[in-house]
Swiss-Prot record:
The keyword Phosphoprotein does not apply. Its main location: host cell. The keyword Acetylation does not apply. Disulfide bonds: none annotated. Plays a major role in the shutoff of the host protein expression by cleaving mRNAs probably via an endonuclease activity. This host shutoff allows the virus to escape from the host antiviral response. Hijacks host RNA splicing machinery to selectively target host RNAs containing introns for destruction. This may explain the preferential degradation of RNAs that have undergone co- or post-transcriptional processing. It is found in: Host cytoplasm; Host nucleus. The record marks 202-203, 206 as: Important for efficient shutoff activity. The record marks 195, 198-199 as: Important for efficient shutoff activity and nuclear localization. This is Protein PA-X.
Length: 252
């Protein structure tokens, strides 16, 4: 699973996931499923934010990369992917600026158009079950919840899906592709089932598999959201080195 994650995701997402697991004292060599889940969640959060801006009239618009209008205000503030101290600093700043109620738990995004925090969920189970778990944990009407599944289903607070259909379709397609690539490598069952995960862990401890075949339809392009986060945690030389090593696979 670890090899798959390093092949399938942008190296900057991988490093953010590594930093998050290290912050909580988790070993990605052992908890490989959690490593994959964190990377997936990070990518969905960044895709949620990508290309969405607010114009001078306060309207939400979608702008593709390299468009001259890209200097417009970003619609979403990305909180996920930052260390806890910085994340709470961002949340406090947003609350002080907008008057929003401070959430009890760290959310993933803030929507400047709708003036609300957003909690993003990516589940391997039924979306409604995961939604209820999130809602019971957060217990706040001021945090909007949006859940995606690997099967193309989604559920959001009051059926308000925030994004346009095309933007959500991009996320669903990416999740479905990740599922298919895991299935092709015999990783999906262990990703879904804890029992299968334990079997896979024992197998991995006995023999480390060489990475095989690169995943199809994986974007080499750096997410605009990652470009925003990048200066905060990675210098340009390190970024270049990571990009140069992206998707390299050891030869047999």
């Amino acid at each position: 699973m670890e090899d798959f994650v390093r092949q399938c995701f942008n190296p900057m997402i991988v490093e953010l996931a590594e930093k998050a697991m290290k912050e909580y004292g988790e070993d990605l060599k052992i908890e490989t499923n959690k490593f994959a889940a964190i990377c997936t969640h990070l990518e969905v959060c960044f895709m949620y934010s990508d290309f969405h801006f607010i114009n001078e009239q306060g309207e939400s618009i979608v702008v593709e990369l390299d468009d001259p209008n890209a200097l417009l205000k970003h619609r979403f503030e990305i909180i996920e992917g930052r260390d806890r101290t910085m994340a709470w600093t961002v949340v406090n700043s947003i609350c002080n600026t907008t008057g929003a109620e401070k959430p009890k738990f760290l959310p993933d995004l803030y929507d400047y158009k709708e003036n609300r925090f957003i909690e993003i969920g990516v589940t391997r189970r039924e979306v409604h079950i995961y939604y209820l778990e999130k809602a019971n944990k957060i217990k706040s009407e001021n945090t909007h919840i949006h859940i995606f599944s690997f099967t193309g289903e989604e559920m959001a607070t009051k059926a308000d899906y925030t994004l346009d259909e095309e933007s959500r379709a991009r996320i669903k397609t990416r999740l479905f592709t990740i599922r298919q690539e895991m299935a092709n490598r015999g990783l999906w069952d262990s990703f879904v089932s804890p029992k299968e995960a334990k079997k896979q862990l024992k197998k991995n401890l006995k023999s480390q598999e060489l990475c095989v075949g690169l995943p199809t339809k994986v974007s080499h392009r750096t997410s605009p959201a990652l470009r925003i986060l990048e200066p905060m945690w990675m210098d340009s030389n390190r970024t270049a080195a990571l990009r140069a090593s992206f998707l390299k696979c050891p030869k047999k």
